[in-house]
């Protein structure tokens, strides 16, 4: 049992029935925080393409943390995704990852559980690197990402304007196990020569 007396959250792939809850959770961040640079609330219909771009297998996943309810539907506590970093083909072995937790789930290990499940699911995929963009300041996200062996690699200064001010985004990088078919580029990076 968690400190709040509820059952441990269950982490699983997202399903279509989650879409309304996922959209509501995301809209909290759209309306109240600079964590996402979306500025207009989304609808479940408007998020359908996003949902469909995260199947249950492959390199682009959606993992959901849910809390079982004694009666009625489970309650969504958060979600994590891996998405294409960029649309060009050479970026295919890189993914951008994100995690969003319900505001009242802070401190319950939901983000850790989501990233654990996401990276376990991605372990067999042809992915070489994961990247995360984190609006600054965000100490909790920094701690989460460093716990998962991400390292800060740079900051886009004042890259987004929301709520009447500019925000920096720090980028984090994590090495993954896949992406081995590099045509020798890995050797060049490691030794400085081919």
UniProtKB/Swiss-Prot annotation:
Residues 9-173 form the N-acetyltransferase domain. Its EC number is 2.3.1.-. The keyword Acyltransferase applies. It comes from the Bacteria. Keywords: Acyltransferase, Transferase. Disulfide bonds: none annotated. One of its GO terms (molecular function) is acyltransferase activity, transferring groups other than amino-acyl groups. The keyword Transferase applies. Belongs to the acetyltransferase family. PAT/BAR subfamily. This is N-acetyltransferase.
């Amino acid at each position: 049992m968690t400190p709040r007396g509820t059952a441990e959250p269950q982490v699983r792939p997202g399903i279509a029935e989650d879409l309304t809850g996922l959209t509501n959770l995301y809209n909290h961040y759209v309306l109240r925080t600079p964590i996402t640079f979306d500025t207009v609330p989304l609808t479940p219909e408007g998020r359908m393409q996003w949902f469909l771009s995260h199947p249950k297998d492959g390199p682009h996943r959606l993992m959901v943390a849910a809390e079982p309810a004694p009666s009625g539907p489970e309650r969504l506590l958060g979600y994590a995704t891996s998405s294409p970093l960029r649309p060009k083909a050479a970026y295919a072995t890189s993914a951008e990852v994100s995690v969003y937790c319900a505001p009242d789930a802070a401190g319950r290990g939901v983000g850790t559980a989501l990233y654990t499940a996401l990276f376990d699911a991605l372990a067999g995929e042809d992915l070489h690197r994961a990247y995360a963009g984190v609006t600054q300041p965000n100490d909790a996200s920094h701690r989460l990402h460093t716990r998962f062996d991400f390292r800060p690699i740079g900051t886009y200064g004042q890259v987004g304007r929301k709520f009447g001010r500019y925000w920096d985004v720090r980028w984090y990088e994590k090495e993954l196990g896949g992406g081995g078919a590099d045509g020798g580029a890995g050797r060049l990076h490691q030794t400085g020569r081919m």
